[in-house]
Design a protein with these regions (language model features):
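Single, function-defining residue in the core of a domain
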Residues: 1-69, 84, 96-99, 106-108, ...
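Short alpha-helical "recognition helix" segments of helix-turn-helix
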Residues: 72, 76
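Phosphate-interacting basic helix/loop segments used at nucleotide- and nucleic-acid interfaces
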Residues: 114
Length: 442
């Protein structure tokens, strides 16, 4: 069901509309109810700051990164009517503790699953294109976070801030996050990627980074559902046997699994069949390994172009960190459970914006990724804050106006030959270097 249909369903019985009711149109109340029950926090008690309002304050922490949590709740006007118009800071702290992080996690996962199953996406050779990659977030430096998440270390001990390691599964053509998993810095990305297996949809191709080469993980991935394929760059030291050659640059190969891998993954066979494809870009050779062993369904010419789309998940991480999070290095929350809650709220806020962008491009000859995320984000925030709510029947009209506005923010075509090396500029020195000793200066 699209967001506009939620407007129609609610408008028949919303007479005296509150701001919280307007926000419920964007995030289906049924999803919230299921998430609260699943997390065991649902209650029949009527509070002035109900769980739905606390959920929106957690989402608002990402939409209004430079505002305090107290200001966010008051600007969104999410508390129910009462004697006091403003929400006390202590009430928000207690509300976040009542909400917990699992209810926000379930809300994110339910919304992502419902959106993917009801929307249509661009496909490649009949498969939905997905991507998996990891990213880290920095937390406040305190003992609780160090014990929960850990940090990098060197010969002198632990350094830097505690960090959360995250691994995400994303639909490429829309940047919609299907699921995420995060844990301590001590947990590797491949272990986190295994937790994403239940979210892998049928008829999909997942693009991995080179670091995810694990035959146990890849075997589980391709057997997770119907036509669940994978692709990643081949290592330089890859050991294989050629089963047969499709052409000089395209081969079906046999990969041998190690005893250690078979011990860790009980269902892993001694050998796996894969496809090794070689192609050139600007005179440089590249090799990709995949489970797409049918050359008739997946022609060589198509395989040489698809892997470049893995970079879309890097762009999505940039949108989250630089766009929503305003390039802030450290998350707001100071306790481990609240850090987890804030991260799930950040992913949920990102998906809500992406879902609205999906609605804006529906039945249009443009992709959601062709719209400017930063401009769309500002318009969505303005919709939440300034849309008049005196009449429920007007809400679908305002929402249509929002979608029309988003369609104006079409990005220019990407340059095909652009090149951005992974380097950083040298920072200028704040103070001049002292090149002579004090005795010479005197």
């Amino acid at each position: 069901m699209s967001l506009i249909q939620h407007f129609d369903n609610m408008s028949s019985f919303l007479n005296d509309v509150h701001t919280l009711d307007k926000l419920k149109q964007v995030l289906d109340p049924d999803i919230l109810e299921q998430a609260f029950k699943h997390a065991g926090v649902a209650t029949v008690r009527k509070r002035r700051l109900p769980l739905e309002a606390v959920m929106w304050s957690v989402i608002g922490m990402s939409l209004f990164r430079n505002e305090t949590v107290w200001d966010i709740a008051n600007r969104l006007d999410i508390s129910l009517p009462g004697k006091n118009k403003l929400v006390a800071p202590s009430a928000l702290v207690q509300g976040r503790q009542r909400l917990g992080y699992e209810s926000v996690q379930h809300t994110f996962q339910l919304l992502a699953h419902k959106t993917f199953s009801t929307q249509s996406f661009e496909q490649w050779c009949g498969l939905n294109l997905l991507a998996v990659d990891g990213v880290s977030f920095r937390t406040h430096d305190n003992q609780d976070n160090r014990e929960a998440f850990g940090s990098d270390s060197n010969q002198h001990g632990e350094v830097s801030y505690p960090q959360v390691r995250m691994c995400s599964l994303m639909e490429v053509s829309s940047h919609l996050l299907l699921d995420s998993s995060f844990d301590s810095r001590r947990i590797g990305e491949m272990s986190l990627a295994q937790r994403l297996l239940p979210a892998v949809p049928d008829n999909s191709l997942t693009l991995f980074d080179r670091g995810y080469y694990s035959l146990g993980l890849l075997y589980q991935w391709q057997n997770q559902g119907d036509n669940t394929h994978w692709m990643l760059p081949a290592r330089k030291d890859l050991q294989y046997q050629v089963e047969h050659s499709i052409n000089d640059n395209d081969k079906i190969v046999i990969l041998s699994t190690s005893p250690q891998a078979r011990k860790k993954f009980e269902s892993l066979p001694e050998t796996m069949m894969a496809r090794l494809t070689t192609y050139k870009v600007d005179g440089k050779s590249y090799r990709v390994l995949s489970s797409l062993i049918d050359p008739l369904r997946f022609p060589y010419e198509e395989l040489t172009e698809v892997y470049t789309q893995r970079w879309e998940i890097e762009l999505a991480f940039r949108e989250i960190k630089q766009g929503l999070n305003h390039s802030k290095h450290t998350l707001r929350s100071k306790k481990p459970d609240m850090v987890r809650q804030e991260l799930w709220g950040l992913l949920l806020a990102y998906n809500l914006i992406r879902i609205i962008m999906l609605d804006a491009t529906k039945d249009e000859d443009i992709l959601p990724t062709q719209l400017s995320f930063s401009q769309s984000m500002r318009q969505v925030i303005a919709f939440f804050m300034f849309t008049p709510i005196h009449s429920a029947s007007k809400l679908p009209i305002h929402y249509d106006e929002l979608l029309t506005t988003l369609r104006l923010f079409i990005l220019p075509d990407r340059l095909p030959d652009r090149h951005y090396p992974r380097v950083i500029r040298k920072k200028p020195n704040k103070y001049p270097y002292k090149r002579k000793c004090q005795s010479v200066l005197n």
